[in-house]
Amino acid sequence: MGELMALLVTSVLVNNVILTQFLGMCPFMGVSKKKSSAIGMGVAVVFVIVVAALVTYALYYLVLVPLQLEFMDLITFILVIASLVQLTEMFIKKTSPALYKSLGVYLPLITTNCVVLNVCLVNISNSYNFAQMLVYSIGTPLGFALVLFIFSTIRERLEQSEVPNAFVGNPIALIVAAIMARAFSCFTGIV
């Protein structure tokens, strides 16, 4: 149990995919201007990653390995992720048109979000058992969503602040991201 808790803390805080691995930077910079968009994207990414991880893990060990088709893992995972994103997009469009509109082009970009594929590949390459795979696949997108939410709240406050003209927009956002990365590096000693 302690090992699973350490894996959860590591995947959420210590090895955060945005701040330490620099994965998922496109939605991080693009969707973080409003809290509502960041929350919607965070929930969508959590859902897609958890389901994609479960499906790809099962496909890999129940289909690809027995048929000795392990070399097909990448293309199989990409197809699974693309299908899940399409289903998620259709669901959000039907249930929350405002969220769908606010996410814009970033929702279909979850298909190419390297965080999703990274989680699926790390589960296989690290030979995680089912419990480890589940914890890592929940922790990583939760860390993504946490950082996205914190960053969006800071960016909303920055919109109300006086920022020098040279730093308005993305420059100040990148400075804030660097400070956040430094702050999150303090969690390294926990595990």
Predicted regions and their residues:
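Structural signature of hydrophobic alpha-helical transmembrane segments
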Residues: 3-19, 68-83, 134-147
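C-terminal ends of transmembrane helices
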Residues: 23-37, 85-99, 151-162
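Small-residue-rich segments of transmembrane alpha-helices in multi-pass membrane proteins
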Residues: 44-54, 104-119, 169-181
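Ordered, amphipathic secondary-structure segments that act as subunit-interaction surfaces
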Residues: 61-104
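Interfacial loop-to-transmembrane junctions
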Residues: 156-174
